[in-house]
Amino acid sequence: MIVFDNGVRVFINTSTNKDIYVGISGFGFEKDIGGILGTAHLLEHILISFDVSRFIANASTARSYMSFWCTSIRGRSTPVDAIRTLISWFFDRDGLKHYFPVSKIKYHIKELENEYYFRNEVFHCMDALTFLANGDLYNGGRLSMLDRLDDMPLILQDRMCAITGPNIVIFVRELNDVVLSLLVSTFGTLPSCPLTIPCTLPTPIGGKIIMMPSPFYTVMVRVQPSLYNILSILCLYEIYHLVDYETVNNKLYVTISFIHEHEYESFLHGSARLNFTIYKKIRLHYGDDFLMNMYLSFPCIRHDIFDYLTIINTNVSTMIPSLEQNIYQSIKTGDYIVVYPNFSNTMSNVADRQLHKTVVIDTNIVYVTKPTTVIDLMKKHTHNDMYIKYSDTEFIDYVQLALGLRRKIHKNVNGIHIRHQFSADDIKTILESETFMKYSKSKPAAMYQYLILSFFVSGNTIEDILQHRESVIKLCRTYKNKILLGKQTRYDIQTLSSFVCGIFKGPSITSEYLTDIMWKLKRKGLIYSLEFVELQKNMFYLFMFTIYPEDVTSYLTSRKLFTSRCVVVSKKCNVEDFSSMKKDIIIKLR
């Protein structure tokens, strides 16, 4: 690790697939509380800009930090080009960027609204901790920010000026004189302390149960943010599933999730203890996303994480019991937060400023001081690869499992690939639990992508498909049939979601071209993401949720590279209507 004079920390991470990865602590959704919620997320969308033909890049905003990364495409750019590109998001010739024109901000706010719509249609993205800390359940920004459009340039400028050296963590895959010079002349020029220190009054958030959609019964227990507690949590994270951490307002919470309600109840009542046995040597081999989160969340970790290995493996037998004592003391005093699974649309007693409703109650749980049972947690095993075909009847369940456990989903033409550390029995236990089954069915919008895909690739009518909705994934398995487009180029339907999808054909269509279209639509504020699957040579199935379906359709139908197409445009309504979808697609069975 290299530390600049202003406090910027630079790590060489040869195992990452990113040429440069930059994180900024104290710069996430929490920063917006008391101001305009969504400012941090808006800034992320404005800053990131790159040539999709030369680079792969992305950015994200979390509760307490923001992160940005960029990597070069081999043969089209170099790692140094990627580093220069990321630096250009923050710095221009005059130094740190300060100018944000209203004309550009407007389209990014529209993009934020599309992201909100996407995340609420497909995922459960509500943040219980930020809500309890006086934020909203969703803090990523909404279309209502347009009401303060003229104020946003100055607000964004002030936010940029709040960036300081000690808040910056940088990972680079390779470090040489050129890269070091680029970093020193840019991030190395940031101030070492803020010009102003805002006065914030922390909101007490302990002793609450919040009822919201969740695949598990989750308890967030506040513990002291000491170095030994942090290292102990990292040990538990390496050994066990469903153990993690959260930070809010500089407070540290150990999160422990339970599949069964009786285990959750016995833990809170004190009648059961958790089996926190460290049965193997700790290695601290984490991915770069986890490491970035860790360095940004815990400023007390001032060295490379591997420098702590000897301390951990020498003292783990005393560190873990100390953390346990802290956990049980907080449980006894009620200093914890519970996320209790609830899927009712009518049950609520509070609402945030965006009128998202939920249930929040006090924890009035009597603690028993004599535990009689021990709860064994799910252990992490060696890495396994799980491949699920689109034809698998449990496809959606596995997707929800991966999302609920924060696992990356890799897609290809025939299915998805998930890398995990679960045993077969543990996966079966989760998938068969009543709470998880309710969770996986609580967001049906994702099914529309496969309903329409099945219509295009199979010989089934839309009526047949709707009658077998529960097994629709099986119906849309990868057929070897030849698809011939008919005369009708558009179907208008009504569903519970607003989206545009369809099949598009053209001799020059490539995945790179579709990726470029996605970014152009994003910059126009028309979509958040675009999913596509190649059905056969030069023919793709496209799907995108959008609150502007007509604008997206007009853009797609004006692309000259699409020589043939059939578009499905869905208007959001309370009642579904697929009656317009008469089979005009010819399937040549083979």
UniProtKB/Swiss-Prot annotation:
InterPro entries: Peptidase_M44 (IPR005072). Zn(2+) binds at residues 41, 45. Signal peptide: none annotated. This is Probable metalloendopeptidase G1-type. Its cofactor is Zn(2+). The keyword Hydrolase applies. It is an enzyme of class 3 (hydrolase). One of its GO terms (molecular function) is zinc ion binding. Its EC number is 3.4.24.-. Keywords: Hydrolase, Metal-binding, Metalloprotease, Protease, Zinc. The active site is at residue 44. Coiled coil: none annotated. The keyword Disulfide bond does not apply. Seems to be involved in viral proteins maturation by cleavage at Ala-Gly-|-Xaa motifs. Belongs to the peptidase M44 family. The gene is GP045L. Pfam families: Peptidase_M44. One of its GO terms (biological process) is viral life cycle. Binds 1 zinc ion. It comes from the Viruses.
